[in-house]
């Protein structure tokens, strides 16, 4: 029997050799030159009779070889980092892995190549990037994500780490066959990439609030290629949902397709790159890990900045071109009219690199229309253009070597909506964010949270505020607010001057806007984090001086979230957006990229650069180099803001609120063109109102505020925290009283209010409100007044005021009693003022009731108010009760019924609350 089995095996091998002569020879040649892994040999069938090992092994190899070649025969072959076999008939894709590629680290970059154009599912968004390796376990191949968070130089501790912290085995794959001549492993790539590898089902559930399931029958592979250093693969996933969602951009929301691009590449090793240590005074994204061999008792983490590998061609020259510049490609999908602005935004950074010793460190090239590569290819840094219904954002993600922090890839994505709508009637850009629910309006900590929800916008905007699984809250906020800023600039451009802007003026405005956006995103791809202190470099009177802004810069850093620079009335308009990078940007690039002179003399390790880097970082106390990033703007620091400008926000905010009032006057005088819908007037009115309160909210950060600098002990004698001066705090309170709480803070003519009609279009992408149609002016004003008032009296601020009394000399701090008394006398002026009685307007009555409610909540302990705040609220209520009683006794006969009822009801509320508090004790 064995004889016939052996004969049959020989016949099969001969048949295979007839059909596969070339591959067979090639395989034998590889076998002679390759080193067969012992682990792979152990997986072969055991041979009991040692005398026949050679013969049996030869037969087994021939059978396995025939099975291997029978699988990949007559299908397309792509050779490269990993060899890919593509079967058009079956749709199967096979991946060939060499023995030496097992247990070796590779970088995976996953990108959403096509989306649905709304609700956070946008083309070009990064999905993930991580380090992985293939590990063979018996007859299966594991796809394992490497744990890079813990490291050590000690061999003994490495054994401990391996037991203590696990890698993540994402998939266990069947080994289809093994080539016996070279031990190459063949796997079915469908098992890996035709599953929901990137977790899109979770993304869709989060973003669309619906259950979508991957449908294998609708999923398939798209373009793919294999290069010597990387493999590029497209997977198209079909998703189905029984009920669907409220997507409006697809024909039927029960089914949709998403394309995902995978880039698997080998890590660049021994290329001379030296990781650079991070410093908290300079804002870089970092690669951090815990080093168990670090003997420093105060710090177990090692932090490297993320940066490109940039080396001077001439190390001895003070200014040298790089050996290999950083190249950005403008995608061929970018409209022609925007390419110059994008190019300028990228090249703005060459000025900063000159301070680091590099000439023309960055280059920009145009992607050909017939390019044979994809924008998501790891070898190309591409500025991409996409379209959406509801996004309006740009993003600049980068991918790094997780061992060293070396940036290996960066792609910037820009939504066409950011610039397209600026050119289509200036009001149109505001439409996406024009309405708001004032109860969600938050101020005093992070004005970025002033996101206006919308009944007028309908379900689409409600989703937009809750989706964005792929975008952080700050990124999504930037997208919303940046669009608003551009809209306000365009609206101001058309309203504030006596004449309408020319097409050239509007073109220049759009050019400046897009250039600024690109510069900001390129900064991220160079490794830089946000710097929300960057907008405070110039004094208010310098903002429109182009002799300064064209040389030194409009701001200290383009990495801030910058508002449009609108000149006050009577001042000639300067730059709307920055055209050059600022001093902080130059200094940060110097820290990250300047060549260490010692590097040419000896081998450099990161720790040996500490003194060199410290000399650069010592400049941090200079005002124009101040740094505050995302986690800093939640504090009450009036100089660490988003959407502010100048070193004196008090003056800047007043200028912008005056501009808003002037725009209201222009709208009141009949701004609409003949035949234009009154709904456009409502959009503009809303936009100006939002702009007004955004600037008012900046003032609240002065109350109990303090500046913060990331100083080190050797920097200088300055303090890390410096409370805002008492004078500035009092000025801020005065401005808030004048522009927010005063009786005449808001004055709109009946004619204007009666023209604020809503849009009545009802179709996909546009929802008409089904509630009251007229403009709810009382609710809008009160909700925003209430937001600012509540922020002034929240527990965090009162605790801060209490602490600051211990941090300043006597008499130099704004006390809680002064804050409460100033607000009460300003809001209840009609009660405390002497003289003839005046009727209290409806807007003032609403504000006074809100103020009273806040004090009652503080006193009755329904909030986290500190004890001193609670007793002071009791005191203020007693004073208010007495003042109301006195006023009613003096002038009750001459008061109108609105005012009389309001005062009597307010006094009664206070009396009942005071009595209730006494009973509770």
Tell what function each PLM region has.
Residues 347-358, 388, 523-524, 528, ...:
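Sec-exported extracytoplasmic/periplasmic mature domains
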Residues 366-386, 512-568:
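The catalytic-center signature of Zn2+-dependent metalloproteases
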Residues 9-20:
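Bacterial N-terminal signal peptides
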Residues 2-10:
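Bacterial N-terminal signal peptides that target proteins for export
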Residues 338-345, 506, 510, 514, ...:
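Stable alpha-helical elements in mature extracytoplasmic
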Residues 497, 504-509, 534-921:
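Conserved catalytic/binding loops enriched for acidic/polar residues
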Residues 30-334, 352, 356, 361, ...:
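Auxiliary tRNA-acceptor-end handling modules of aminoacyl-tRNA synthetases
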Residues 25-27:
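Boundary at the C-terminal end of the N-terminal hydrophobic targeting segment
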């Amino acid at each position: 029997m064995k004889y016939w089995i052996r004969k049959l095996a020989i016949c099969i091998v001969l048949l295979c050799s007839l059909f596969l002569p070339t591959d067979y020879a090639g395989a034998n040649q590889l076998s002679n030159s390759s080193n067969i892994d012992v682990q792979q040999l152990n997986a072969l069938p055991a041979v009991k009779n040692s005398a026949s090992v050679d013969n049996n092994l030869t037969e087994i190899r021939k059978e396995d070889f025939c099975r291997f070649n029978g699988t990949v025969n007559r299908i397309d072959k792509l050779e490269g980092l990993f060899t890919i076999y593509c079967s058009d008939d079956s749709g199967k894709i096979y991946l060939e892995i060499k023995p030496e590629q097992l247990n070796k680290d590779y970088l995976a970059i996953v990108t959403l190549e096509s989306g649905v154009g709304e609700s956070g599912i946008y083309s070009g968004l990064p999905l993930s990037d991580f380090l992985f390796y293939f590990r063979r376990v018996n007859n299966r191949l594991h796809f394992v994500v490497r744990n890079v968070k813990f490291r050590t130089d000690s061999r003994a501790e490495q054994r401990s780490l391996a037991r203590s912290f696990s890698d993540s085995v994402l998939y266990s794959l069947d080994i289809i066959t093994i080539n016996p001549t070279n031990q190459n492993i063949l796997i079915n790539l469908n098992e890996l990439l035709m599953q929901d590898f990137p977790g899109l089902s979770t993304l869709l559930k989060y973003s669309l609030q619906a259950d979508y399931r991957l449908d294998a029958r609708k999923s398939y592979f798209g373009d793919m290629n294999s290069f010597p250093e990387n493999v590029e693969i497209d997977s198209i996933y079909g998703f189905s949902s029984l009920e669907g969602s409220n997507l409006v951009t697809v024909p039927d929301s029960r089914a949709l397709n998403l394309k995902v691009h995978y880039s698997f590449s080998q890590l660049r090793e021994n290329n001379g790159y030296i990781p650079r240590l991070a410093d908290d005074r300079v804002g870089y994204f970092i690669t951090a890990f815990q080093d168990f061999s670090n003997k420093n008792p105060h710090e177990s983490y090692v932090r490297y900045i993320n940066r490109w590998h940039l080396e001077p061609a001439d190390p001895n020259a003070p200014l040298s071109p790089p050996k290999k510049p950083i190249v950005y490609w403008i995608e061929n999908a970018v409209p022609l009219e925007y390419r110059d602005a994008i190019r300028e935004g990228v090249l703005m950074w060459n000025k900063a690199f000159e301070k680091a010793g590099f000439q023309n460190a960055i280059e920009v090239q145009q992607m050909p229309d017939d390019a044979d590569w994809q924008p998501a290819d790891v070898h190309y840094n591409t500025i991409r253009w996409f379209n959406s219904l509801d996004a309006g954002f740009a993003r600049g993600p980068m991918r790094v070597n997780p061992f060293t922090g070396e940036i290996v890839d960066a792609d910037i994505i820009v939504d066409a909506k950011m610039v397209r709508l600026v050119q289509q009637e200036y009001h149109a850009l505001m439409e996406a964010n024009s309405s708001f629910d004032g109860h969600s309006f938050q101020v005093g900590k992070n004005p970025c949270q002033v996101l206006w929800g919308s009944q007028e916008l309908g379900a689409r905007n409600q989703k937009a505020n809750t989706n964005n699984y792929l975008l952080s809250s700050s990124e999504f906020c930037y997208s919303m607010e940046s669009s608003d800023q551009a809209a306000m600039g365009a609206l101001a451009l058309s309203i504030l001057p006596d004449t309408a802007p020319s097409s050239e003026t509007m073109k220049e405005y759009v050019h400046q806007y897009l250039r600024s956006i690109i510069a900001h995103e390129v900064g991220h791809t160079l490794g830089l984090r946000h710097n929300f202190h960057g907008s405070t470099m110039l004094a208010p009177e310098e903002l429109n001086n182009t002799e300064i802004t064209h040389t030194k810069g409009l701001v200290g850093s383009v990495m801030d979230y910058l508002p449009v620079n609108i000149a006050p009335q009577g001042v000639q308009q300067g730059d709307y957006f920055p055209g050059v990078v600022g001093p902080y940007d130059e200094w940060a690039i110097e820290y990250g990229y300047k060549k260490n002179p010692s590097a040419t003399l000896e081998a450099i390790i990161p720790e040996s650069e500490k003194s060199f880097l410290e000399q650069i970082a010592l400049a941090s106390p200079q005002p124009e180099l101040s740094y505050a990033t995302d986690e800093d703007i939640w504090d009450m620091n009036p100089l660490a803001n988003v959407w502010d400008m100048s070193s004196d926000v008090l003056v800047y905010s007043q200028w912008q609120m005056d501009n808003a009032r002037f725009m209201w006057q222009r709208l009141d005088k009949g701004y609409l063109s003949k035949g234009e819908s009154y709904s456009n007037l409502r959009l503009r009115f809303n936009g100006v109102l939002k702009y007004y309160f955004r600037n008012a909210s900046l003032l609240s950060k002065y109350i109990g505020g303090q500046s913060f600098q990331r100083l080190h002990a050797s920097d200088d004698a300055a303090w890390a925290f410096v409370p805002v001066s008492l004078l500035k705090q009092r000025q801020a309170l005065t401005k808030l009283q004048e522009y927010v709480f005063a009786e005449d803070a808001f004055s709109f003519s009946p004619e204007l209010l009666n023209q604020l009609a809503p849009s009545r279009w009802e179709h996909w992408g546009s929802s008409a409100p089904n509630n009251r149609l007229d403009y709810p002016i009382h609710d809008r004003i009160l909700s925003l007044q209430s937001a600012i008032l509540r922020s002034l009296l929240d527990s965090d601020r009162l605790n801060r005021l209490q602490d600051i009394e211990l941090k300043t000399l006597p008499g130099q701090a704004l006390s809680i009693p002064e804050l409460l008394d100033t607000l009460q006398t300003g809001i209840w002026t009609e009660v405390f003022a002497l003289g003839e009685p005046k009727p209290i307007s409806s807007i003032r009555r609403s504000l006074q009731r809100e103020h009273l409610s806040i004090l009652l909540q503080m006193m009755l302990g329904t909030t986290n108010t500190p004890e001193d705040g609670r007793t002071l609220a009791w005191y203020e209520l007693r004073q208010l009760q007495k003042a109301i009683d006195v006023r009613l006794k003096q002038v009750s006969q001459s008061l109108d019924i609105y005012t009389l009822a309001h005062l009597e009801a307010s006094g009664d509320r206070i009396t009942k609350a005071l009595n209730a508090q006494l009973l509770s004790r």
